[in-house]
Amino acid sequence: MIFSTLEHILTHISFSTVSVVITLHLITLLVNEIVGLYNSLEKGMLVTFFCITGLLVTRWVYWKHFPLSDLYESLIFLSWSFYLIHMIPSFLKKEKNSLNVITAPSAIFTQGFATSGLLTEMHQSGILVPALQSQWLMMHVSMMVLGYAALLGGSLLSVTLLIIIFQKDLIQVFDKRKHLLNESFFFGEIQYINEKSNIVQNASPSYVRNYYRSQLIEQLDHWSYRVISLGFIFLTIGILSGAVWANEAWGSYWNWDPKETWAFITWTIFAIYLHIRTNKNLRGANSAIVAFIGFLIIWICYFGVNLLGIGLHSYGSFTLTLN
């Protein structure tokens, strides 16, 4: 009872904190910046991160297994991964970056879906099925979910890049507010180039727009590549550890189970992305399109088996019931 109450409290504190932070930052889009709110997002994200961490630890202690046994727990861990990826660059460089624009809302929406009424039946865990009672559970599933989080974040940066490339007029909308975007822009704030050389200052408005646009595209492409590379490493480790676990549990390293097949397709798509990035002539829009395809494939891989409830990886499947 105590653990259940603590989990309930941590869930609501984390979601309420982030909701307040979002509201405050939305207000700053309509009025001038309010003193004291400049770093409110990072502080709110930090509080939420520790609450989600406490929630996972609580379930781990209470149910006596690593909290990655069903869709609800994996979504909470995915949300935790987004929070982690969000904060690491800020702690390392102490500056804003375009990654924050993606990771913050991703974490919030993932957590919101996990705590919604759709997965209520999964909030109460239970005894693991024999196949999941292995030390490989933590290694395999955590690496896969961390990989999904990084790949999704990097892919969304690529989607943003595509929007900017194919809709040039979009930049003009943001030009009304401190050269393209105010630094307090939604969720973590894209940091546009601070250098203001005399050439740029004396240039025509169209030249300035093109300059900032090219710098933004370069920054998005840079962060997308770094985050996807990290996610690809996690995904590779997850697939390899899963193969070893499958051999122990089912007597075969690879069974072409639906989850395994889609995981392999996901790995192949992002391997193609990384290969394209080695060619300078194909960077930008070409690699971003591949990343966008990978983004769609990840959701098929992550939710597909759970929704269909088929295959050897259908332990955490769920069905939607209508009242």
Curated annotation (Swiss-Prot):
Taxonomic superkingdom: Eukaryota
InterPro entries: Cyt_c_assembly, Cyt_c_biogenesis_CcsA, Cyt_c_biogenesis_CcsA/CcmC
Membrane topology: Multi-pass membrane protein
Predominant localisation class: plastid
Any Pfam family matching the protein: Cytochrom_C_asm
Location of the protein in the cell: Plastid, Chloroplast thylakoid membrane
GO terms (BP aspect): cytochrome complex assembly
Cross-referenced NCBIfam families: cytochr_II_ccsB
Name of this chain's protein: Cytochrome c biogenesis protein CcsA
